[in-house]
């Protein structure tokens, strides 16, 4: 059951987020614009989950490393699934933005 939940929410083996960011990973924060305005990871871009499908053109390189984040990890898990379904090959769920910020 735990493995199943980890797979659904995108949590797997521990990743070195610091290294991914140093190598050019794009952090996509899928919270609302007002949530993002209240605080975010420097260098991240905000594409709310509700408009992600309409804004895929902002993510031109489908082979780029993308780390999704939100407030808790739920929306970023959905975003990861959406991006994978649209052909993005290297997408990671970073979970909540505050925890991700601490990791990088």
Model-predicted segments: where are they?
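Rhodanese-like catalytic fold shared by cysteine-dependent sulfurtransferases
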Residues: 2-16, 20-25, 33-64, 74-104
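N-terminal glycine-rich beta->alpha transition that marks the start or flank
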Residues: 29
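Short active-site loop at a secondary-structure junction
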Residues: 67
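Short cysteine clusters
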Residues: 70
């Amino acid at each position: 059951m735990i493995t199943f939940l980890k797979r659904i929410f995108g949590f797997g083996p521990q990743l070195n987020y610091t290294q991914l960011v140093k190598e050019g990973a794009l952090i996509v924060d899928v919270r609302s614009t007002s949530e993002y305005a209240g605080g975010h990871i420097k260098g991240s871009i905000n594409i709310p989950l509700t408009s992600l499908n309409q804004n895929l053109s902002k993510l031109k390189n489908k082979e780029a490393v993308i780390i999704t984040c939100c407030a808790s990890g739920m929306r970023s898990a959905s975003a990861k699934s959406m991006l994978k379904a649209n052909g993005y090959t290297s997408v990671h769920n970073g979970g909540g933005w505050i925890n991700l910020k601490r990791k990088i």
